A protein has these predicted regions:
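Extracellular interdomain linker/stem segments of modular secreted and single-pass surface proteins
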Residues: 83-96, 206-214
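Long, low-complexity serine/threonine/glycine- and acidic-rich segments characteristic of extracellular
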Residues: 6-85, 101-104, 108, 122-208
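Surface-exposed, proline-anchored Ser/Thr-rich loop/turn motifs
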Residues: 99-106, 114, 209-225
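Short, solvent-exposed beta-strand/turn "edge" segments of beta-rich domains on protein surfaces
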Residues: 110-118
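Conserved catalytic region of serine esterases and O-acyltransferases that act on ester linkages
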Residues: 1
Length: 225
Protein backbone atom coordinates (compact mmCIF):
# COMPACT_ATOMS: atom_id res chain seq x y z
CA UNK A 1 0.00 0.00 0.00
CA UNK A 2 1.04 3.58 -0.69
CA UNK A 3 1.44 5.96 2.26
CA UNK A 4 -1.43 6.97 4.51
CA UNK A 5 -3.78 9.77 3.39
CA UNK A 6 -6.55 11.74 5.05
CA UNK A 7 -10.02 10.90 3.75
CA UNK A 8 -12.90 13.37 4.17
CA UNK A 9 -16.45 12.03 4.14
CA UNK A 10 -19.13 13.63 1.93
CA UNK A 11 -21.26 14.89 4.84
CA UNK A 12 -24.52 14.20 3.03
CA UNK A 13 -26.54 15.42 6.00
CA UNK A 14 -26.76 19.21 6.32
CA UNK A 15 -28.82 19.19 9.50
CA UNK A 16 -26.06 20.79 11.55
CA UNK A 17 -22.91 22.83 11.12
CA UNK A 18 -20.56 20.14 12.37
CA UNK A 19 -17.52 19.49 10.14
CA UNK A 20 -17.35 16.51 7.82
CA UNK A 21 -15.87 13.40 9.42
CA UNK A 22 -12.25 12.68 8.47
CA UNK A 23 -10.06 9.61 8.96
CA UNK A 24 -6.74 8.22 7.74
CA UNK A 25 -6.40 5.16 5.55
CA UNK A 26 -4.21 3.41 2.97
CA UNK A 27 -6.55 3.42 -0.07
CA UNK A 28 -3.96 3.25 -2.87
CA UNK A 29 -2.46 -0.11 -3.80
CA UNK A 30 1.09 -0.42 -5.15
CA UNK A 31 1.19 -4.19 -5.61
CA UNK A 32 -0.88 -7.32 -4.96
CA UNK A 33 0.76 -10.70 -5.38
CA UNK A 34 0.90 -14.24 -4.07
CA UNK A 35 3.50 -16.98 -3.90
CA UNK A 36 4.32 -20.22 -2.11
CA UNK A 37 6.01 -20.25 1.31
CA UNK A 38 9.12 -22.43 1.31
CA UNK A 39 10.76 -23.37 4.62
CA UNK A 40 8.99 -20.46 6.27
CA UNK A 41 10.18 -17.90 3.71
CA UNK A 42 8.64 -16.13 0.72
CA UNK A 43 9.64 -13.26 -1.55
CA UNK A 44 8.16 -10.86 -4.10
CA UNK A 45 9.84 -8.79 -6.78
CA UNK A 46 7.98 -5.96 -8.52
CA UNK A 47 8.48 -2.55 -10.09
CA UNK A 48 7.07 0.45 -8.21
CA UNK A 49 4.52 2.36 -10.34
CA UNK A 50 4.99 5.95 -11.47
CA UNK A 51 1.65 6.79 -9.84
CA UNK A 52 2.81 6.71 -6.21
CA UNK A 53 2.38 9.64 -3.82
CA UNK A 54 6.14 10.47 -3.57
CA UNK A 55 5.35 11.46 0.02
CA UNK A 56 8.46 9.87 1.57
CA UNK A 57 6.13 8.61 4.29
CA UNK A 58 5.53 5.09 5.56
CA UNK A 59 3.59 2.63 3.43
CA UNK A 60 1.95 -0.57 4.62
CA UNK A 61 2.13 -4.26 3.70
CA UNK A 62 -0.76 -6.59 4.55
CA UNK A 63 0.27 -10.25 4.63
CA UNK A 64 -1.81 -13.42 4.68
CA UNK A 65 -0.82 -17.09 4.54
CA UNK A 66 -2.61 -20.44 4.82
CA UNK A 67 -1.35 -24.00 5.22
CA UNK A 68 -3.15 -25.97 2.51
CA UNK A 69 -2.87 -29.21 4.50
CA UNK A 70 -3.82 -28.16 8.04
CA UNK A 71 -5.88 -25.09 7.17
CA UNK A 72 -3.95 -23.00 9.70
CA UNK A 73 -3.92 -19.30 8.81
CA UNK A 74 -1.54 -16.45 9.55
CA UNK A 75 -1.80 -12.73 8.94
CA UNK A 76 -0.03 -9.53 9.84
CA UNK A 77 1.26 -6.22 8.54
CA UNK A 78 4.54 -4.34 8.18
CA UNK A 79 5.04 -0.58 7.82
CA UNK A 80 8.75 0.02 8.41
CA UNK A 81 9.46 1.29 4.89
CA UNK A 82 9.19 4.58 3.01
CA UNK A 83 7.30 5.26 -0.24
CA UNK A 84 9.09 7.77 -2.46
CA UNK A 85 12.03 8.49 -4.73
CA UNK A 86 12.80 7.72 -8.35
CA UNK A 87 15.09 5.06 -9.78
CA UNK A 88 18.31 6.17 -11.48
CA UNK A 89 17.64 3.63 -14.24
CA UNK A 90 14.42 4.37 -16.11
CA UNK A 91 12.38 1.71 -17.88
CA UNK A 92 12.06 1.90 -21.68
CA UNK A 93 8.68 0.15 -21.87
CA UNK A 94 6.34 2.13 -24.17
CA UNK A 95 3.80 -0.62 -24.90
CA UNK A 96 0.53 -1.03 -23.03
CA UNK A 97 -0.54 -4.27 -21.36
CA UNK A 98 -1.33 -7.24 -23.58
CA UNK A 99 -4.93 -8.46 -23.29
CA UNK A 100 -4.39 -12.17 -23.89
CA UNK A 101 -8.03 -13.13 -23.44
CA UNK A 102 -11.28 -11.27 -22.83
CA UNK A 103 -14.69 -12.88 -22.49
CA UNK A 104 -18.04 -12.91 -20.72
CA UNK A 105 -18.94 -15.98 -18.62
CA UNK A 106 -16.62 -18.47 -20.37
CA UNK A 107 -13.98 -18.78 -23.08
CA UNK A 108 -16.53 -19.76 -25.73
CA UNK A 109 -17.77 -16.15 -25.83
CA UNK A 110 -17.29 -14.35 -29.15
CA UNK A 111 -17.74 -10.67 -29.97
CA UNK A 112 -21.45 -9.96 -30.33
CA UNK A 113 -22.44 -13.12 -28.47
CA UNK A 114 -25.47 -13.60 -26.25
CA UNK A 115 -25.16 -13.50 -22.45
CA UNK A 116 -27.43 -13.46 -19.39
CA UNK A 117 -28.46 -10.26 -17.60
CA UNK A 118 -25.57 -10.50 -15.10
CA UNK A 119 -22.59 -11.69 -17.15
CA UNK A 120 -19.20 -12.43 -15.58
CA UNK A 121 -16.39 -10.37 -17.12
CA UNK A 122 -12.92 -11.95 -17.35
CA UNK A 123 -9.71 -10.56 -18.85
CA UNK A 124 -6.30 -12.24 -18.83
CA UNK A 125 -3.44 -9.72 -18.95
CA UNK A 126 0.32 -9.57 -19.30
CA UNK A 127 2.77 -6.69 -19.04
CA UNK A 128 6.53 -6.86 -18.59
CA UNK A 129 6.52 -3.89 -16.20
CA UNK A 130 3.29 -4.66 -14.37
CA UNK A 131 -0.37 -3.59 -14.46
CA UNK A 132 -1.34 -0.32 -12.77
CA UNK A 133 -3.88 -0.76 -9.97
CA UNK A 134 -2.74 2.11 -7.70
CA UNK A 135 -5.92 4.18 -8.01
CA UNK A 136 -3.95 7.31 -7.11
CA UNK A 137 -3.88 9.04 -10.50
CA UNK A 138 -6.91 10.33 -12.41
CA UNK A 139 -7.46 8.50 -15.68
CA UNK A 140 -5.16 5.53 -15.05
CA UNK A 141 -7.62 3.13 -13.43
CA UNK A 142 -8.53 -0.24 -14.90
CA UNK A 143 -12.04 0.43 -16.19
CA UNK A 144 -14.94 -1.37 -17.82
CA UNK A 145 -17.31 1.12 -19.48
CA UNK A 146 -20.59 -0.12 -20.95
CA UNK A 147 -22.52 1.95 -23.52
CA UNK A 148 -20.33 5.00 -22.74
CA UNK A 149 -22.40 5.46 -19.58
CA UNK A 150 -21.01 6.85 -16.32
CA UNK A 151 -23.63 4.79 -14.48
CA UNK A 152 -22.31 1.65 -16.18
CA UNK A 153 -18.62 2.46 -15.60
CA UNK A 154 -16.79 0.13 -13.21
CA UNK A 155 -13.37 0.51 -11.57
CA UNK A 156 -11.73 -2.93 -11.64
CA UNK A 157 -8.48 -2.16 -9.79
CA UNK A 158 -9.41 -4.23 -6.75
CA UNK A 159 -10.56 -7.19 -8.87
CA UNK A 160 -7.15 -7.78 -10.44
CA UNK A 161 -4.78 -10.47 -9.18
CA UNK A 162 -1.42 -11.77 -10.32
CA UNK A 163 -1.10 -15.42 -11.25
CA UNK A 164 1.53 -17.15 -9.07
CA UNK A 165 4.72 -18.23 -10.78
CA UNK A 166 4.01 -16.30 -13.99
CA UNK A 167 5.85 -12.95 -14.11
CA UNK A 168 3.68 -10.11 -15.34
CA UNK A 169 0.62 -12.30 -15.88
CA UNK A 170 -2.65 -11.63 -14.10
CA UNK A 171 -6.40 -11.91 -14.35
CA UNK A 172 -9.34 -9.65 -13.58
CA UNK A 173 -12.77 -11.12 -12.81
CA UNK A 174 -15.84 -8.95 -12.29
CA UNK A 175 -19.55 -9.82 -11.89
CA UNK A 176 -21.36 -7.18 -13.94
CA UNK A 177 -24.55 -5.90 -12.25
CA UNK A 178 -27.89 -6.51 -13.97
CA UNK A 179 -28.13 -5.10 -17.49
CA UNK A 180 -31.12 -4.30 -19.65
CA UNK A 181 -31.92 -6.82 -22.41
CA UNK A 182 -30.62 -5.85 -25.83
CA UNK A 183 -27.35 -5.06 -27.57
CA UNK A 184 -24.51 -3.34 -25.71
CA UNK A 185 -21.03 -2.02 -26.47
CA UNK A 186 -18.25 -2.09 -23.88
CA UNK A 187 -14.72 -0.72 -23.56
CA UNK A 188 -12.08 -2.23 -21.30
CA UNK A 189 -9.19 0.08 -20.37
CA UNK A 190 -5.99 -1.06 -18.69
CA UNK A 191 -2.72 0.77 -17.95
CA UNK A 192 0.72 -0.44 -16.96
CA UNK A 193 2.78 1.07 -14.14
CA UNK A 194 4.63 3.29 -16.62
CA UNK A 195 1.28 4.72 -17.79
CA UNK A 196 1.08 3.00 -21.17
CA UNK A 197 -2.52 2.05 -21.98
CA UNK A 198 -4.45 -0.57 -23.92
CA UNK A 199 -8.16 -0.52 -24.77
CA UNK A 200 -10.36 -3.30 -26.12
CA UNK A 201 -13.88 -2.70 -27.47
CA UNK A 202 -16.40 -5.53 -27.70
CA UNK A 203 -20.14 -6.01 -28.16
CA UNK A 204 -22.66 -8.41 -26.67
CA UNK A 205 -26.39 -9.02 -26.49
CA UNK A 206 -28.18 -9.49 -23.18
CA UNK A 207 -30.99 -12.05 -23.35
CA UNK A 208 -33.36 -12.19 -20.40
CA UNK A 209 -33.76 -15.72 -19.02
CA UNK A 210 -30.52 -16.98 -20.53
CA UNK A 211 -28.48 -18.87 -17.94
CA UNK A 212 -24.69 -19.41 -18.01
CA UNK A 213 -23.34 -22.95 -17.80
CA UNK A 214 -21.60 -23.69 -14.47
CA UNK A 215 -18.27 -25.46 -15.07
CA UNK A 216 -16.86 -25.60 -11.53
CA UNK A 217 -17.11 -24.09 -8.05
CA UNK A 218 -13.95 -23.34 -6.07
CA UNK A 219 -13.85 -21.77 -2.58
CA UNK A 220 -10.69 -19.93 -1.51
CA UNK A 221 -9.84 -18.00 1.69
CA UNK A 222 -10.16 -14.21 1.59
CA UNK A 223 -7.00 -12.14 1.23
CA UNK A 224 -6.23 -9.71 4.06
CA UNK A 225 -5.99 -6.11 2.82
Amino acid sequence: KDSKVTVTCLKNSNKDDSPAFTFTDYPNTIFIGNDSVRNGKFSFTFTVPKDISYSNLQGKMNLYAVDTESGNEAQGNFDNFIVGGTSDTSETDTIGPEIRALYLNDTTFVDGGQVNTTPYFVAELWDKSGVNITGSSVGHDMMLVIDESTVLSYNLNSYYELLPGEDGTGIVKFPIPALEPGKHTAEFWVWDILNNSTVRTFTFEVVEGLKPFLFDVIATPGIAR
